């Protein structure tokens, strides 16, 4: 019930992950999305120094904006025009017809997570050459789709969902 009542934003990653393993919340986020809650995500440090492990500078958001002004950044954050990261860079993502596309820094895998359709998600793995882009074909019954990039060090980046 509490998850369904959340609105706006949720933290998908807190840097406390390095200290206690409780910083990644994609399962809760997916549950909220499956219930129809249109919420974005962010990654943060959640830094409480001093700690046993250095947990600063480990989570952030990258905003898609043509302008570097306070008003533009806030408007794009409110619109969900950003991705959250703990390492990988996502340079482009979106939907073109029935395909979801993503380009990124070299990755070990790209996960496309789709809502509303059993079996609608897909993982693309790096084999021989660096994995820097992925395409996922929509099947027609999805209500939303998002992507997750995992680099070779296990660090992740998450797009906000695109509602279909």
Predicted regions and their residues:
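Charged catalytic cores and adjacent phosphate/nucleic-acid-binding surfaces used
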Residues: 11-164
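Single conserved hydrophobic/aromatic residue that forms the stacking wall/gate
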Residues: 1-13
